């Protein structure tokens, strides 16, 4: 935790990746240096098809916000998934729905034409 706190003081963002997968324990959310939580594509993809997964994702986003953490929904592939994570309050989203993987040069061109790169609005 001391090293993570040092990184925060140097203005680095401390994120927990893959949250909601079996490899990321819930107690990792208790780390005081943590700022952002990246929600697993297994959660975001499953929530569009399963009522229980949607309830689980909703609760995770809500609980993260209660702890002062921002949520990034990973693996967004469809408009339905985009609308779902937006309605549940995710702060950010990423996935092929927004853009396919690209080179740095392609990213420069793409970023000039896309006004909402960073936030769900």
Identify the function of each model-found stretch.
Residues 1-4, 57:
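Heptad-repeat coiled-coil signal-transmission/dimerization helices
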Residues 10-121:
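EAL-family c-di-GMP phosphodiesterase catalytic domain
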